[in-house]
């Protein structure tokens, strides 16, 4: 097999974008045309759906799929390795694009899995409402707090209607009309109550498993306690409680207001307040990212002919197999459409959560709630009649119920719209604030490990940071949330769908189909012969599973057990003589199969220490022929695993992995980038708004008016991105064609924002009131956190300053932008405006054989945690596959200008 140095024209074959007919032999072109009616060869994007109707001698040729059983399996601690023997018979061609791994096993998503918001138990109960219970008083005294709805005469033997006190009276039964107990006397009544020995928990979220088939919950003897109304002078019992101990649990709630240990069993313990555990969807990653082990320090994958034993798989440390697959799918299909077979459900976020469009609440009309009787308050009355000029009591045909309400109907008001919006902001924004803006409530002990679900549950956001009055009237993302991963959220619809594919229980069995993504073999036509096909699959739950909260699933008890892996594959549905003709021509090295990696880029990660704003990087001297440009973004170190290891012990996180799945969200933190070659070339030239060799991305102070679109992005950078993504520049700005404006493109994700702030320098009476001293809705909300019990009394609000009306204070305008998912791109061309075509003329000075070193300097916003600069150097990453003889497969990897691999040496 020839090496790249012997065939230099390969370096530029793909730059010119030749049609396949220009470099395939005339015989193969003719073959493709002759068979196009039922089999499209094209550029190896095939849809083989029509089986031939003649010259088929065995039923095997018409089978749509064949199952290959592994010849070797190794179930290790961190990986599951499997090996297959692919036997491709004569007159057949195996379609590697149709192959997938069929994996079965069991999954324990751990106790942190919660696939819903709120609670499943007593969700209608007030958060601090108590269960019917007995509780301790002073000394050995026992107190009672209970509701008795079950009517019936009480004797010393209990209630007549109660025949089995292990479940009767049932707590869900009582009078069916509002009349009973108000207009009509209810009489004696009974109910169930928890003994004082059962721990105190609010009714909201409380659950006790049944201990008999009738639904009773007692774990011991049921005891009766009798009561009478204190005002009654007789010695008859008016109420009866059947008290019991139960196995009280809170499967999906926790306490946010907890009293000290010495008060739990007393009266103060009745006022503890519960909140639901945070939702945490857990499922396999989009397209099973991370499951297949694409090693970066050797070969974990093998495709080798048994005759030659040369491995066709050469994965390089800086290749982007997973990210390439994500962007390739976006170019081919609509990523918003889900495809359950490959677990394709792209990570997304709610736009209204990332950027809050706070246009207030439409609460012009008050909302009332009324008593069930529809009138009141009712007063006991005595009927009167006229007697001459006076009144006297009327006892003629007058019943005992005489109740009248004075004035308007009694009502209570609630601002439904304001509460709904406040609840939306709390659940979707405030709870996802960085941990520095949260606190642990009194008497609650938070775990030491901040990556655990238990820790994330107990932490509460401080009040007034996110509320209905913050940035009211503006479309603005809270500044502290800009650097928080928006895809780690329970409104990530793709993750929710993938979690639901596995069901709604912690323990589940799975049966999944995993496609091959490695570019050199995922579209290969495998000719007759016997081949060894081997791959490893990760078992690290943090890598293969994804959670809404990004908690450490290893610590939180998740685990996976792979039981079997089979391989399914299809042969092309061709007549034998047709297949043998195709084989004969593909054996000719003129018709070698060439595959280009979709991104065709070498990636490099450069650490950015915490609070760093300047990062220089250097690339040693090399020939830049065939170089296409740079793409770059910023990712967090804690969200980036070491891909070279099957198990990274420092990867204590399970949220989205931008490095692999393109959930980038820190692009807005770049300020400028300079690019300097060690040559005299002033690249990219002086034909832009700003100085050569420098790209200014955003300006906080824009005295010259260089910013664009009511944001702080510069016109120059906007121009560069429009040209790089859509080739829209001097011909005027307009919306790009839909096939270019995909999910990861620039314009679809560019979000400019603007708001006004108080001009503190020109407003003499401005007071910088700290968050703890700001009050708004005092008496109707908690000063600590939205979840806490409300406190205070009605009073005029002291925050925020009015920005509108006759008393509007002086303001300054603040601008910014977000551009999630998108990689910033700088195309490479010495004539900067000729980005659409890469020509020898345009890159003449840098195409010379002399090598050039490259220095780049990135200026970024400071962040309080370590991050990584993720740079993609866009090269030509091409594999050329040659199958000269039966059972022999040879691959040459060409990578200009960064590195080359050769599977034949």
Swiss-Prot record:
The modification N-acetylalanine is found at residue 2. Its main location: virion. The modification Phosphotyrosine is found at residue 893. Induction: Expressed in the late phase of the viral replicative cycle. It comes from the Viruses. GO terms for biological process: microtubule-dependent intracellular transport of viral material towards nucleus; symbiont entry into host cell. The record marks 729 as: Involved in interaction with pre-protein VI. One of its GO terms (molecular function) is structural molecule activity. Gene3D superfamilies: Adenovirus Type 2 Hexon, domain 4, Hexon Major Viral Coat Protein, domain 2, Hexon Major Viral Coat Protein, domain 3. Keywords: Acetylation, Capsid protein, Cytoplasmic inwards viral transport, Host nucleus, Host-virus interaction, Late protein, Microtubular inwards viral transport, Phosphoprotein, T=25 icosahedral capsid protein, Virion, Virus entry into host cell. All late proteins expressed from the major late promoter are produced by alternative splicing and alternative polyadenylation of the same gene giving rise to non-overlapping ORFs. A leader sequence is present in the N-terminus of all these mRNAs and is recognized by the viral shutoff protein to provide expression although conventional translation via ribosome scanning from the cap has been shut off in the host cell. Belongs to the adenoviridae hexon protein family. HAMAP family: ADV_CAPSH (MF_04051). This is Hexon protein. The gene is L3.
